[in-house]
Structure formats: structure tokens, C-alpha cells
Amino acid sequence: LGGCLLIILLAADFFLPMRQLGSFFHIAMNGMAASEKIFKLLELPEPGNTDVENTYTDVKNVQTGAKKPCGDGDIICRDLHYSYEKDREILHGVNITVKKGSFTAIVGESGCGKSTLSAVLMGRNKGYTGSVTVGGTELSEIYEDSLMENITYISHNSFLFKGSVRDNLLMGAPDADDNKLWDALKKVKLDAFVREQQGLDTAVSEAGSNFSGGQRQRFSIARALLHDTPVYIFDEATSNIDVESENDIMELVAELSGTKTIILISHRLANVKNADCIYVLRSGELVESGTHKELVEKNGEFAGLWNAQQSLENFGKGDR
């Protein structure tokens, strides 16, 4: 009996390395798949090398059927439909016009299709039907790199990379000098904080975990400002951050709207009060559009959302 027990105990120790080998093999396969993606990224031409970029463009022309550069002008959606799955359409015939140099807002309850629409405009959600034109050029016919050179997207969870503040900001403008970096930080009211640390060499942990949510978002917007594109899409860029950061970001959006085309997607309607035009989505359909004043007076979908939010935000203030 003792011998059998000993064999059983030894057998468990014998098979343990085999089980570990299987786990290590799985990890190795994941690593190989990830390394392939990294190598493909490293093989992309570096901006600034004209000869390489021209060669890359020539190859891309052949691969994509001679796509076109991004136009500079209005962004127009006509009868826009989009589905993540074949039988589940998210956007149902949306029609919007974003005038060049305007401040346009897209609002609606959660799940109405706001972020899906912004992803279509950025070229991330492909396979739409209908028409989306940027400066007169159909979105599906525009080079992806040309689109990125003309439209900057800022979401609520923009990513900061491990390194330094300088490293992260230079991703927006690789040739920017320190003066431009400080200017961008000043615009988002982070310059004083960064100077109190180690300046532009201040360390940034993975995903910016050593900063608050509001600080991370401000750093991301500073990087976006350095990118300096004609169009900026703010997709819930002020959600889940402190009130002070939200107010500072909205001041910056208002300032940008004087020189850039701004598309602001927000669940908080107070942030879109000064928009030139507000589009209201419900379940993937456009139900209303107009200025804040016009929509409130219409007493429809927007007015209902506005009144509900105002009641919540003002609750208890009268008792103070």
C-alpha cells in the first residue's frame, strides 16, 4: 500500500513539467502572433522619408485601386447605414452635414449610435452603405494615412505609452521642439504640474497609471493639439473625469472651434449648448437637428433629455 501511494505521489511530480510545457507552448504561440504584428508595424515607413513614402504610396495605389487624398471641406453623410453584424444594423439612414470650420455636436442616450458614427467618420468602421464624403471625396476612397493627417480622434480612454511626457507628446508631432511641447501643455493647463515634476522628462507609467484620469485626458489632448489637423472629433472626451478637467477641456474645445472643424460627441448636453448645430440620435436614427435654443423650443427628444439632465444636476442646489 505504501509503495502504491509513493508511486501516485511521484507520478504527479512527473506529469507536472509536462503540463507546464503545454502552458509555455501556448504562451510562446501568443508571443509569436504578437511579434508578427510588431514587425509589421516596424516595417512601416517613417514619416519624413519622402522616397520611402512615395514608394509606399505607389505600392498602396496598386493594392487599393488608386485611392485619393482627403479633401478639405464639409463632411457630409447621406443615407448612412452601418452594421457590426449582418442582421443587426446600428445606423439607419443617417443624414448629417458638418460644415467646414463649424462646431457640430452629436448627442443621444447611451447605445444610440454616437460612437459608431464617429468611428465611421474616422475610417475605423469600414463597410458602411450610403455616402460619407470629406471635402467632396468619398470616405471609402481616401487613403488611411491621408485621413489621419486631416482628422484627429480623441476618445474618453486615449492611451498614454510608457516612457516620458516628451515621448508621448512627440507622437503627435515628431519634429516639434520643446517650446511647442510646452505650449501644448499650457493650453491644457498641465505646464505648471509638469514643471513641478521632472519637466518633459517626467516618467509616464504604462497607460499613464501614475496620473489621474483628468491628467491623462489632458495629456492626450495636448498630443492631439500637436497633431494640428483641420478636423477634431471628441468622442465622450470629458466622461469619467473631474469637473475641473472637464471645464478646462470644454474651454479648449470652444477655442478650437474658431479655427478648426469640431465634432463633439457627448452624453452631457450642457457641453454642446454653444454648438452651431446639434444632431440628436435615437436607436441609430437621426430624430432632430438644430441649435440648442431651437431644439429646446421644439420640446422634442432633445428637450426631454435636457430637462432630465438639468433636474439631476440641479437637484439639491436650491436647499443650500
List the predicted regions and their residue ranges.
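Amphipathic, soluble alpha-helical interaction motifs
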Residues: 24, 31, 41-44, 275, ...
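Conserved E/DxxT/N motif and adjacent residues on the DHp alpha2 helix
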Residues: 40, 47, 170
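Conserved catalytic core of two-component sensor histidine kinases
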Residues: 8, 15, 148
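Two-component histidine kinase transmitter core
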Residues: 44-46, 125
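ABC-type nucleotide-binding domain
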Residues: 55-320
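Membrane-water interface of transmembrane alpha-helices in multipass transporters/channels
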Residues: 1-7
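Cytosolic ends of transmembrane helices, especially the final helix of ABC transmembrane type-1 domains
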Residues: 14-41
